[in-house]
């Protein structure tokens, strides 16, 4: 080993099991940060969810074998995992964890290994979710339907009238229901709809879906990406129907915007973007 190369020990707990769990927790944190920046596709989001479930289960099992003073939560392990990554990749590229050493440390002639220069790489460009505008600029003079304190019969009639007169183009639907003290969300949908000769309405593109709680706090944000473009007519029709089916069923139970939001988000596998509290409501 070259004299100028050292091994930096990171406190991860005894044994490779803790090192592995903590490192995977760091990977989970990276996945979550990518998700916050809309940088994960659907398979990536699925891997995030599976990794989180796996880690939660493994940590729960592992903690049972540890003294109470040494048990760590997922969040604590994330912090250690991120520290491991920083030391390995950025602060000291030649570092080792729990006695494991990079290949370039084992071969002194390879001390200028290009893989150790990752700290010089710029961060991935992109906007954070909070930097994205609440309302898209490209929706000019949209048709807007607002349902507030209406019974189901009136709500269905208003939806029917507005949808039947809408030709095509940008469309905005706002649902705000608070009937009989039933908590609801305000759901705002921006999309481009096509009207076909057979009378079908198809959603060609979903630009945005925002869901707000009663205090106006944004609890779900689905922003348009290439993955949200609906290319199949039947898929578009199915998604559009999910917006209105609860009004057309005619049941007496008050229609809840939260259910509509979950229905639309689930079409894209994005229902996790609703907080558990709002999802339950």
Curated annotation (Swiss-Prot):
Q: Name one GO molecular function term.
A: RNA binding
Key word RNA-binding present: yes
Determine if Disulfide bond is one of this entry's keywords.
no
Sorted alphabetically, the keyword list is: Host cytoplasm, Host nucleus, Host-virus interaction, Inhibition of host innate immune response by virus, Inhibition of host interferon signaling pathway by virus, Inhibition of host ISG15 by virus, Inhibition of host PKR by virus, Interferon antiviral system evasion, RNA-binding, Viral immunoevasion
UniProt short sequence motif Nuclear localization signal, positions renumbered to this chain = 50-55
Location in the cell reads: Host cytoplasm; Host nucleus
Cite the SUPFAM superfamilies for this sequence: S15/NS1 RNA-binding domain (SSF47060)
Q: Where are the stretches annotated RNA-binding and homodimerization?
A: 1-93
Q: Say where the protein is mainly found.
A: host cell
Q: What does this protein do?
A: Binds and inhibits the conjugation of the ubiquitin-like G1P2/ISG15 protein to its target proteins. Since G1P2/ISG15 is an early antiviral protein, NS1 may inhibit the host antiviral response. Prevents EIF2AK2/PKR activation, either by binding double strand RNA or by interacting directly with EIF2AK2/PKR. Also binds poly(A) and U6 snRNA.
| Family the UniProt entry places it in | Belongs to the influenza B viruses NS1 family.
Q: How does the annotation summarize its subunit structure?
A: Homodimer. Interacts with and inhibits human G1P2 conjugation by UBE1L.
**Protein known as:** Non-structural protein 1
What species does this protein belong to?
Influenza B virus (strain B/ID/1986)
Q: Which gene encodes it?
A: NS
């Amino acid at each position: 080993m070259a004299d100028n190369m050292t091994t930096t020990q990171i406190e991860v707990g005894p044994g490779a099991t803790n090192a592995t769990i903590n490192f995977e927790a760091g990977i989970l944190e990276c996945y979550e940060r990518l998700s916050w920046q809309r940088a994960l596709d659907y398979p990536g989001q699925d891997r995030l969810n599976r990794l989180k479930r796996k880690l939660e289960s493994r940590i729960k099992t592992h903690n049972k074998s540890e003294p109470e003073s040494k048990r760590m939560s997922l969040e604590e392990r994330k912090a250690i995992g991120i520290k491991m990554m920083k030391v390995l990749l950025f602060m000291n590229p030649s570092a080792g964890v729990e006695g494991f050493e990079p290949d370039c440390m084992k071969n002194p002639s390879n001390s200028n290994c290009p893989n150790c220069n990752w700290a010089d790489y710029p961060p991935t460009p992109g906007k954070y979710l909070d930097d994205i505008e609440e309302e898209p600029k490209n929706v000019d003079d949209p048709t807007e339907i607002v349902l507030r304190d209406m019974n189901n019969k009136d709500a269905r009639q208003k939806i029917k009238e507005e949808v039947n007169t809408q030709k095509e183009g940008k469309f905005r639907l706002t649902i705000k229901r608070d009937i009989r003290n039933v908590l609801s969300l305000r759901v705002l949908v921006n999309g481009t709809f096509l009207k076909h000769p057979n009378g079908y309405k198809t959603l060609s593109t979903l630009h945005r879906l925002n869901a707000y709680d009663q205090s106006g706090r944004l609890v779900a944000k689905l922003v348009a990406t290439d993955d949200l473009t609906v290319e199949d007519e039947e898929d578009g029709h199915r998604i559009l129907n999910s917006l209105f089916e609860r009004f057309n069923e005619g049941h007496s139970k008050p229609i809840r915007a939260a259910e509509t939001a979950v229905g639309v988000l689930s079409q894209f596998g994005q229902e996790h973007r609703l907080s558990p509290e709002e999802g339950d409501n």
